[in-house]
Amino acid sequence: MLSLRYSLPYLLLQTRESSTKLFTKKPNNVVVCAARGPRPRSPRVWKTRKRIGTISKAAKMIACIKGLSNVKEEVYGALDSFIAWELEFPLVIVKKALVILEDEKEWKKIIQVTKWMLSKGQGRTMGTYFSLLNALAEDNRLDEAEELWNKLFMEHLEGTPRKFFNKMISIYYKRDMHQKLFEVFADMEELGVKPNVAIVSMVGKVFVKLEMKDKYEKLMKKYPPPQWEFRYIKGRRVKVKAKQLNELSEGEGGLSSDEDKIDNEIESEEEDGEDLSEEEEDEKELLGGSQGQITSREPSLDHLDSS
């Protein structure tokens, strides 16, 4: 007679083993959809209004004051109405508007917008004061420029940036105000602010013009022209041969666009100094290659101010 008493436990063991295998397997057996990436989402219907960027807002701000006269109350009223519905003061928009006005050389509007911003207690930075100083100089408002310079110099005596000294020296150099130029240069030396090549060349030209050869020689001996300088080429700091700058760069508070007289003098001097022979140029290239320095192919910085 056939006995089946061991068949049932055997089946139970089989089912238990299979069930444990099913539940103990790793989750890598989960079926992955063929279309990878984030699932598609429907557009959000509650964002129906397009957002206006800061550049377009700056353009609107310029448009609202462009057709107005230079009356202070009229311009200030238009600017107040423009920011009436803003929860916070739109400092970024005003800064971008000032950059656009500076590109368009609207010096009167720059002065008005900057003074309006400062009256609100906003944007009190050295960059704002420098743009105001530059606009006052371009608009031939020398008294206000000197007043602003004296105020900043007295408040930030040792912390005055070098570009402010450079700007004031360039202003006095253009207008042949030699005594005030010497005063600013003396303040630089007293505070230990090292002048750049452009400042040294401008002060040296004034010494030569006034026939002060002894002071010119002392100046050139104290501040000799540098042989090397550092530049950033494609994000890397590279040591290159220094180019003798005869005018200030815009980043250092250089000469303004209206200073054509200085530009013409410097260009004529550069043309006279470009009479080097080919042998001397070859020797310079060989010397530069033997020292293993990287030369720059950037254009000369002497013509940045005229742009």
From Swiss-Prot:
PROSITE patterns found in the cross-reference section: PPR
**Entry keywords, A to Z:** Coiled coil, Repeat
Where do the PPR repeat units fall? 125-159, 161-195
InterPro entries (alphabetical): EMB1417-like (IPR044646), Pentatricopeptide_rpt (IPR002885), TPR-like_helical_dom_sf (IPR011990)
List, as start-end ranges, the regions of compositional bias called Acidic residues: 260-284
Extract the Pfam families matched here: PPR (PF01535)
Extract the coiled-coil ranges from the record: 238-292
Chain positions covered by the region annotation Disordered: 248-307
Report the family membership: Belongs to the PPR family. P subfamily.
PANTHER family assigned to the protein according to its UniProt record, in alphabetical order = OS01G0757700 PROTEIN
UniProt protein name = Pentatricopeptide repeat-containing protein At4g21190
